From Swiss-Prot:
GO MF terms held by the record: peptidyl-prolyl cis-trans isomerase activity; protein folding chaperone
Name of the featured protein: FKBP-type peptidyl-prolyl cis-trans isomerase FkpA
Single Gene Ontology BP annotation: protein refolding
Family as reported in the entry's similarity comment: Belongs to the FKBP-type PPIase family.
Enzyme class label: isomerase
GO cellular component: outer membrane-bounded periplasmic space
Keywords: Isomerase, Periplasm, Rotamase, Signal
Record's catalysed reaction(s): [protein]-peptidylproline (omega=180) = [protein]-peptidylproline (omega=0)
Organism for this UniProt entry: Escherichia coli (strain K12)
Residues in PPIase FKBP-type domain copies: 164-249
């Protein structure tokens, strides 16, 4: 948090310094044309400076929006005034006051983020449980002892994959509200992985079908990404996957040559 916070302040400083008239308008600015760009800058140094300021300004604006989600709304006029005063060497705060204020603000952001994460985690856990219970009542749906809820759409043929096997799948992953977070179909490329190298819900679930099979997995958070979550997947999310098992590649058998060499050595001693 601390390193990010410093980058955020730098973004504000640079954005305002390089482009003083910057405003935080609600509406997006009209895209510049090639003619506008050529007329605005006398040389590459000016253009590069502006590009840096625009990039940092956008980053800072996004950072402020994220803080607003935590209930923290900074006064943008004061933010800009602070930067301008610093460049004019007319700061209204001493270095010590600045340091103390920023430390307190950092603690506030961290506390608010933790509180939001815990609230989101509790809400997602409750909604996920309700979703799983409802899905479990549908025809052909089973619930395992671990809490995995699944529906075999097509069983497939051959042997079911083992932990050490490599599987090739196509899949679509969504949250319980239908929001898609991953899709191999749209990427145009199936995913290949060792079965025991993914989230537990997948490792367990894919053993219920064979090559050519299809399955719907509704995975509780404890078999997915848990309370921590990952980018794109909030904490304590129940995940919904539609998976097609395209191929199963058995793990290579251990090389029998060392054993054969040992037997040959024993024979030679006799």
């Amino acid at each position: 948090m601390k390193s990010l916070f410093k980058v955020t302040l730098l973004a504000t400083t640079m954005a305002v310094a390089l482009h003083a008239p910057i405003t935080f308008a609600a509406e997006a600015a009209k895209p510049a044309t090639a003619a506008d760009s050529k007329a605005a800058f006398k040389n590459d140094d000016q253009k590069s400076a502006y590009a840096l300021g625009a990039s940092l300004g956008r980053y800072m604006e996004n950072s402020l929006k994220e803080q607003e989600k935590l209930g923290i709304k900074l006064d943008k006029d004061q933010l800009i005034a602070g930067v301008q005063d610093a460049f004019a060497d007319k700061s209204k705060l001493s270095d010590q006051e600045i340091e103390q204020t920023l430390q307190a603000f950092e603690a506030r952001v961290k506390s608010s983020a933790q509180a939001k994460m815990e609230k989101d985690a509790a809400d997602n856990e409750a909604k996920g449980k309700e979703y799983r219970e409802k899905f479990a009542k549908e025809k052909g749906v089973k619930t395992s002892s671990t809490g995995l809820v699944y529906q075999v759409v097509e069983a497939g043929k051959g042997e079911a994959p083992k932990d050490s096997d490599t599987v090739v799948v196509n899949y679509k992953g969504t949250l319980i509200d239908g929001k898609e977070f991953d899709n191999s179909y749209t990427r145009g490329e199936p995913l290949s992985f060792r079965l025991d190298g993914v989230i537990p819900g997948w490792t367990e679930g894919l053993k219920n079908i064979k090559k050519g099979g299809k399955i719907k997995l509704v995975i509780p958070p404890e078999l997915a990404y848990g309370k921590a979550g990952v980018p794109g997947i909030p904490p304590n999310s129940t995940l919904v996957f539609d998976v097609e098992l395209l191929d199963v590649k058995p793990a290579p058998k251990a090389d029998a040559k060392p054993e054969a060499d040992a037997k040959a050595a024993d024979s030679a001693k006799k």
